A protein has these predicted regions:
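Active-site loop/oxyanion-hole signature of alpha/beta-hydrolase fold enzymes
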Residues: 43, 55-96, 267
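Conserved alpha/beta-hydrolase catalytic His-Asp/Glu region
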Residues: 152-207
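Conserved hydrolase catalytic core segment
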Residues: 91-133
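Conserved HGGG/HGGXW glycine-rich cap/lid loop of the alpha/beta-hydrolase fold
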Residues: 17-64
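Catalytic histidine neighborhood in serine/cysteine hydrolases
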Residues: 247-260
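Conserved serine/cysteine hydrolase catalytic core
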Residues: 184-249
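Post-His helix in hydrolase/transferase enzymes
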Residues: 267-280
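Catalytic histidine-centered segment of alpha/beta-hydrolase-like enzymes
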Residues: 258-270
Length: 285
């Protein structure tokens, strides 16, 4: 696939990095998960571009966006998205978010309905109970743990990431995603995401009751669900009761289960049925 063009744009008081794939339709603004970066969208960008323009942002504190010491909440991300659309001269976009990005996309569509043409929620945005949220954070614990680790070399970093059973099979796209986040530090290399930023983010997202946004959504919504857990069925991000409520309470929502995929595979792995579901939704079918 072709590599994206990187561009710095104005967020709400910070510079936000965008990975851009050109296309004649769109744009589709993509929002990643809590410890991810813009390169998590490479597989889907390869599917959707060049038909659609893909704009994948690094959230503040991640990737090549600026990393202020504080200010990690839905509210700040919404302001960043609104500001970057202004900076790019974009009135409306399709918004697609994965995991935390789905919560952000949902809230953005509720607060800025005039800016969202369609909304794709990829394995996120559900109103989870405290127990369900605890299970999710236990499931993503390995991703959180890597934020405090130092490895002797890039090769050692990648070797450690390859051991994760939940992100298999390994691919050039997954390797590129991890390479993108590596930076030098004393004693070797580490991720460029500071754990204190993610701790603030995690604390804030636990307080969000996403069901409060459901009735406010005015655009068509596609909810993509990963039916496989990371380590067990307990850490599924969209349990049946949760996704049932989403499609019942969001005025124009449909669901699509991406068979055989877990929370990471749903964006990192090839899946033709998923691709077709997205294409049909974008075309209004």
């Amino acid at each position: 696939m072709s590599a994206p063009i990187m561009k710095k744009v104005k967020g709400a008081g910070v510079k936000i990095n965008l990975a851009m794939w050109e296309g004649s339709l769109g744009p589709i603004l993509c929002v990643h998960g809590i410890t991810a970066n813009c390169r998590c969208w490479d597989v889907l960008a390869d599917v959707l571009a060049p038909e659609y323009q893909i704009l994948a942002m690094d959230l503040r504190g991640r990737g090549r966006s600026e990393k202020p010491a504080k200010g990690y909440s839905l509210e700040t991300h919404l302001r960043d998205m609104n500001a970057l659309m202004d900076d790019l001269g974009i009135d409306r976009a399709v918004v697609m978010g994965h995991s935390l990005g789905a919560f952000i996309g949902l809230a953005f569509a509720a607060q800025y309905p005039q800016r969202v043409d369609r909304l794709i929620l990829v394995d996120g945005g559900g109103d989870l109970s405290k127990e369900q949220m605890d299970n999710v954070f236990q499931g993503i614990k390995p991703a959180l743990d890597r934020l405090t680790m130092v490895f002797p070399s890039v090769s050692d970093y990648l070797t450690a990431m390859k051991q994760a059973t939940y992100i298999q099979p390994w691919s050039t796209e997954i390797e590129g995603y991890y390479r993108y986040e590596i930076e030098s530090t004393e004693g070797g290399v580490c991720t460029n995401i500071h754990p204190s930023r993610i701790a603030e983010e995690a604390n804030n997202i636990r307080k969000v009751k996403s069901a409060a946004f459901y009735s406010q959504i005015r655009c068509p919504v596609l909810v993509l669900r990963a039916p496989q857990g990371l380590f067990s069925d307990d850490d599924i991000l969209l349990p049946e009761d949760v996704i049932d409520r989403m499609v019942r309470e969001i005025p124009d929502a449909r669901r699509f289960d991406v068979d055989g995929m877990n929370h990471y595979g749903i964006v990192f792995q090839p899946h033709e049925a998923r691709n077709q579901a997205i294409r049909e939704f974008l075309k209004g079918l």
